[in-house]
Amino acid sequence: MAANQDTTQLPSSDPKAGPDLKAGVDFDSLAENSPLLGHIDGEAVILVRQGQQIFAIGATCTHYGGPLAEGLVVGETIHCPWHHARFNLRTGEAEGAPALSPVSCFTVQREGSKVKAGKKCETNARVPLGRTPASVVIIGAGAAGAACADMLRAKGYEGPVTLVGNEEPGPVDRPNLSKDYLAGNAPEEWIPLRTREYYESIHVELVPNDPAGHIDTAKRTTTLRSGRVLNYGALLLATGAEPRSLAIEGVELSHVFKLRTLADSKAIIARAGQVKHAVVIGASFIGLEAAASLRHRGLEVTVVGQEKIPLEHVLGKELGEFVRRLHEQNGVRFCLADSPRIIRESRVELSSGQSIGAGLVVLGVGVTPRTALAESAGLTVDNGVVVDENLRASAPGVYAAGDVARYPDPISGDRLRIEHWVVAERQGQAVARAMLGIGGPFRDVPFFWSQHYDVAINYVGHAPSWDAVELQGDLDGRNATVIYRRKGRTLAVATIGRDRESLAAEERLLTEPRPTY
């Protein structure tokens, strides 16, 4: 399913489900903060009651088409159960990624005991702005950069915005590159986050394939590889991360691939059509997602990993073992507690002495933040660009977001650098608000999802280490919650088949000093 909210036909909630909201429903039938699914002129719409107020907005998330009627109402927002996008109940605005586009909003009237929703109202997220920069330059056209550009325009900023990228065609739905697109379930037209025509329509200059080579923080300029010089009032560094390689013989061979860009994914797909056996090096999230996708294409797949249990350092023993069983049930072979020694033309030789046939090799061995540009500009760098609670870097007017940013986490008190798509997008949105003088400290709880065949794992929070793990439910029944604690405090929650519980856990982690379960 596409993440491009403007050019893709998204699935929707059933447009005939529930009552005709133009005809009206009884006020007393609306439970507090409990969405009621109905329809208006063939469009699925939800009603939400808060006290005497009634809100009516579109029922289909603009990210991947999730059903907002099954979401969680928090204040004047509703959170999508699939990937935790947030929409304003009053305006329909997409307040929190991964959704970037608003849903429709509708007028609501009370006629005695009846509540009727009527005409669509204009979505207007604009608020009075503080002092705004003369121009904005965004270096990096990934998740954070694209989300920042969108939010600047959504909030009413009218100055020049330039979005500078490293590659064609511009911002893409990167999670799909290891999931549905790589598996062959998503066409290429689903992959762009936004089209060039979209950026032209909102007057954002997209500069693909011309990366920044130098920043002068004193003059507030950045120079691109082409020699073009851009002046900025505010600058966002969203340079992301670079896939790691391996220091072994054969890693430079033509059938060995990293997986980060659309070009990478296309190259893997092309090679997959020519061979029967693939080896994935690294039992990481991206490595395992790639393994699942290549199995879907009919290849024999072996995953090589140094750990004894896949993802144990992130998900714990029980959930890690479940992930392994799931992949084995789908035909993946594992060589764990092992590592590659040499990659040859048709085989991978392991440290254990095993030799595995491989016409295709995919590296999923982690990433390194791209900090060279920040370092050359004199910014403070320590395992990422160091930023404050408002994502401001150490030079005036400069911000950082996404995989490259290391920020103070208000929940744990630690400095974090998170490599999650949704976190990057939300940080980009937060930077846009900060640039316009309408933001506050970045406080979002980290969230990611990982798809393995027909099983999605949702994870909220951040637990680099823990001293207790609690499993609730049945993993093999695909209905479970895993809670990670340290010194009695809940740090993170993973769920399978419990979407609303994942949303509730995210909210508890944000609002409760010591969230309990």
PLM segments and residue spans:
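FAD-site-proximal beta/loop scaffold in flavoenzymes
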Residues: 92, 252-275, 347-349, 354-430
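Beta1-alpha1 glycine-rich phosphate/pyrophosphate-binding loop at the start
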Residues: 131-205, 244, 291-315, 504
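N-terminal pre-ligand scaffold of iron-sulfur
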Residues: 1-74, 109-121
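Mid-to-C-terminal Rossmann-like scaffold of FAD/NAD(P)H-dependent oxidoreductases
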Residues: 133-137, 404-500
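C-terminal catalytic lobe of FAD-dependent flavoproteins
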Residues: 57, 354-380, 453-517
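Glycine-rich dinucleotide-binding loop and its adjacent helix/turn
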Residues: 239-297
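Rossmann-like dinucleotide-binding cores of NAD(P)H-dependent redox enzymes
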Residues: 169, 175-192, 266, 277, ...
